[in-house]
A protein has these predicted regions:
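Structured secondary-structure scaffolds
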Residues: 4, 12-13, 64-176
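N-terminal, positively charged nucleic-acid-binding surface of large information/translation enzymes
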Residues: 1-93
């Protein structure tokens, strides 16, 4: 099944997942100051830049300060490392498993999952704050389960527990 992230069934899944995560206390509101690439719609750390430029657009990111919502990804760092080490076939081939483990040795930062509507007008509105939309890379990753009818769909129940993904190496870090 092919799905677009603009479809209502996808929006319903994203809204549900966001609300579930928010209700569990895994999403918080905070101010962020950092380097922002307009072309990527993404914040970068200094260490991710190439000669001070966005690695994709080769342009200097803008330093901005704004309030957004964040997913407590840092809380899952040790669990992820343990899971990958205890399940060697979880990421294959080995070189990419090692790459992900190397990435996870650095402090895992919480993930900014929103953009203010005042700056970005398109996107799925956060169910707990109508002034914000979901960051595209957070909602796009959920299309794997929304296409399968998450959470009750028969296709989801059949395929997701044993799913295997083939991920291009240039988006490995985003998926990891």
């Amino acid at each position: 099944d092919f799905i677009r992230t603009t479809e209502e069934r996808h929006k319903r899944v994203v809204t549900r997942v966001l609300q579930d995560i928010y209700d569990k206390g895994e999403i918080y509101y905070s101010e962020y100051e950092g380097l922002y690439c307009v072309g990527c719609e993404r914040f970068y750390q200094e260490r991710e830049l190439v000669d001070g430029l966005c690695p994709d657009h080769k342009k200097e990111p803008k330093r901005i300060k704004e309030s957004n919502y964040f997913f407590r990804m840092s809380a899952y760092q040790n669990w992820l490392i343990d899971h990958i080490n205890q399940n060697p076939d979880f990421i294959r081939p080995k070189q990419y498993r090692n790459e992900v483990l190397s990435f996870l040795k650095e402090p895992l930062e919480d993930l900014c999952i929103s953009r203010p509507k005042s700056r970005l007008t398109w996107g799925i509105t956060l169910p707990f704050d109508e002034n914000y939309v979901t960051y595209v890379w957070f909602d796009a990753l959920l299309n794997y389960v929304s296409a399968l009818g998450y959470p009750e769909g028969e296709t989801y129940q059949t395929f997701w527990p044993s799913v295997q993904h083939i991920i291009a190496k240039d988006i490995l870090k985003t998926h990891a």
